[in-house]
Regions:
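A short secondary-structure junction signal
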Residues: 100, 134-139, 167-171
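Short, glycine-/small-residue-rich phosphate/pyrophosphate-handling segment
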Residues: 117-158
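Conserved helix-turn-beta segment immediately C-terminal to the redox Cys motif
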Residues: 112-116
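Active-site/pore-lining binding-face segments in mid-to-C-terminal subdomains
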Residues: 143-188
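Short histidine/acidic/glycine/proline-rich micro-motifs that form metal-
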Residues: 16-20, 95, 129-132, 161-163
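Conserved short-loop catalytic and cofactor-binding motifs
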Residues: 65, 90-93, 125, 129, ...
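N-terminal beta1-alpha1-beta2 submodule of the flavodoxin-like/Rossmannoid cofactor-binding fold
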Residues: 1-91, 96-111, 174-179, 184, ...
Length: 188
C-alpha cells in the first residue's frame, strides 16, 4: 500500500484471563493480519479485567447530561477508543452472551448510542467459545458498535475447548487474517 501513515489500533479484551485467554489469541491474530497489510501500526491492548469498570446504575445521567457520574476507569478507556483509528473488541461467550466485563463496559457507553462519537472508526468483533453462541455475541457486538457510530468491518469466531486449539483452525486463521486486512483497508 502506498499510504504509510501510522494506524492506531486498540484491541480490547473482555476476558478475565487476560493474556492467557483465547480471546487475546484471536485479537493477536487479527493484529497480525493488519500488520501484514500495513506495517505502520501502533497497537495497544486493553484488558478490561485490569480496570475498574463499575456496572451501570441506570441513572441515565449520560443521556441527560452527556457524562457518567461514576468515578472509575471508563472515561479513560473511552478516550483511548476515541484516539484509535480501529478497534478490535473481543469477548468470550458466557451463557450465549458477552462476558460480564464486556457487558458492564458497553452498558456504561450508553450515552454514545444517543450521541454517536465513533463515525470514521472501524471495528472488528471477536467471540471465543467452546462451540456455541459466537454468532450471537458477534451479532450483539456489531449492533452495539454500530449504534456508537462505528462501522463494523469484520467478525471472528474461534471455538476451542483447549486454549489455542481451535476446532475450526483453518477457518479461524483465514478469518483473523482477513479481518485484520479489512480493518486496515477501511481505515486507509
Amino acid at each position: 500500500m502506498g499510504d504509510q501513515r501510522v494506524i492506531r489500533i486498540l484491541a480490547m479484551v473482555a476476558s478475565h484471563t487476560g493474556k492467557f485467554s483465547n480471546t487475546y489469541r484471536l485479537a493477536q491474530a487479527v493484529l497480525q493480519g493488519a500488520r501484514a497489510a500495513h506495517p505502520a501500526i501502533e497497537e495497544e491492548f486493553v484488558f478490561l479485567s485490569d480496570h475498574d469498570v463499575r456496572p451501570s446504575t441506570g441513572c441515565i445521567t449520560c443521556l441527560r447530561k452527556g457524562y457518567c457520574p461514576q468515578q472509575d476507569d471508563v472515561p479513560r478507556l473511552q478516550e483511548r477508543i476515541l484516539a484509535a483509528d480501529g478497534i478490535i473488541f473481543g469477548s468470550p461467550v458466557y451463557m450465549l452472551h458477552v462476558s460480564a466485563q464486556a457487558k458492564a463496559f458497553l452498558d456504561r457507553c450508553l450515552g454514545w448510542a444517543h450521541r454517536p462519537p465513533l463515525q470514521g472508526k472501524y471495528v472488528v468483533t471477536i467471540a471465543s467459545s467452546l462451540g456455541l453462541g459466537g454468532d450471537l455475541v458477534n451479532g450483539y457486538l456489531a449492533q452495539v458498535w454500530t449504534s456508537f457510530g462505528a462501522q463494523v468491518v469484520g467478525s471472528v469466531e474461534g471455538q476451542a475447548i483447549i486454549k489455542g486449539m481451535w476446532l475450526n483452525r483453518e477457518q479461524v486463521l483465514e478469518e483473523t487474517a482477513r479481518a485484520g486486512r479489512d480493518l486496515v483497508r477501511a481505515i486507509l
